[in-house]
Amino acid sequence: MSDGNDTAVHDVHAADAADERFLVRNPRQLRQLLRSLIDQRSLINAHIDGRDRSFPTALLELDEDEDYLLLDGSPQEASNRAAEQADHLLCFAQLERVLVRFRLQELQRVDNDGHVAFRAPLPDELVHLQRRELYRLETPVTDSPQLQLPAAEDRSEALSMRVVDISGGGLAVVVPTDCAVFSLQKRYPAVLSLPDGPDLEIELVVCNLLPQRQPNGIEIKRVGMRFDILPRGGDSAIQRYIFRIDRQRKARRNGEL
């Protein structure tokens, strides 16, 4: 992930009213979710001091007797030094396409079979964003919405991306790991083009940046964003698209198409 931009962002770990419903404080449930991150070898994006600067990592071990975990270090020594000196790491991951977010403090750099790792106490709480009421549709490659970002000060040309999943609350795109266009909690004006029309002028806020590994081994970055501004009728247009794709998929499964 990005190791360059070090601009401060809002501390998105502070649970707002929307996230409070998804806050996990029960020790048994918290350990279970952390254990699942290990078992599923989930990629984690660790933001140093909750800022834009981040590195990809993974949970290696969970010591439930001493309430400590072991986090893999970065291949870049500069990131390891920054993490060692940081007050905390703000970590984002996914479990079965559901966002997991937690903060690690009191990091201690250790050697793990010749590789850098970090030992840290288990977090006191963890956000598990099970927003099932916002049904997310994984979009078909041949029938996907497109997201266009206009030219800006930091880029001379407009940027067009395929939307990989969408709901009534937001959408996601994937970009190369070295893409520095998106920053946490930053707002972006954009145009969302639905296959059925219309083109919607919207504003998006970046909620998470997650590393992912494709089946061919190539690493990419998934950018999850929520709708901050939708034009009148925009929500209905998005729901119509979701309904059409979902209906077509069910018809194919039933042999009707």
From Swiss-Prot:
One annotated GO molecular function: cyclic-di-GMP binding
Keyword terms of this UniProt record: Bacterial flagellum, c-di-GMP, Nucleotide-binding
Start and end residues of each PilZ domain: 130-244
GO cellular component: bacterial-type flagellum basal body
Chief location: other
Biological process according to GO: bacterial-type flagellum-dependent cell motility; regulation of bacterial-type flagellum-dependent cell motility by regulation of motor speed
Segments traversing the membrane: none
This protein's record includes keyword Nucleotide-binding: yes
InterPro entries with a match to the protein in the record: PilZ_domain (IPR009875), Split_barrel_FMN-bd (IPR012349), T3SS_YcgR (IPR023787), T3SS_YcgR_PilZN (IPR009926)
Keyword Acyltransferase carried by entry: no
Compartments (UniProt record): Bacterial flagellum basal body
Highest taxon of the lineage: Bacteria
Pfam families (UniProt xref): PilZ, PilZN
Family: Belongs to the YcgR family.
Stated role: Acts as a flagellar brake, regulating swimming and swarming in a bis-(3'-5') cyclic diguanylic acid (c-di-GMP)-dependent manner. Binds 1 c-di-GMP dimer per subunit. Increasing levels of c-di-GMP lead to decreased motility.
Subunit structure: Monomer. Interacts with the flagellar basal bodies.
Name used for this protein in its record: Flagellar brake protein YcgR
Lineage: Bacteria, Pseudomonadati, Pseudomonadota, Gammaproteobacteria, Lysobacterales
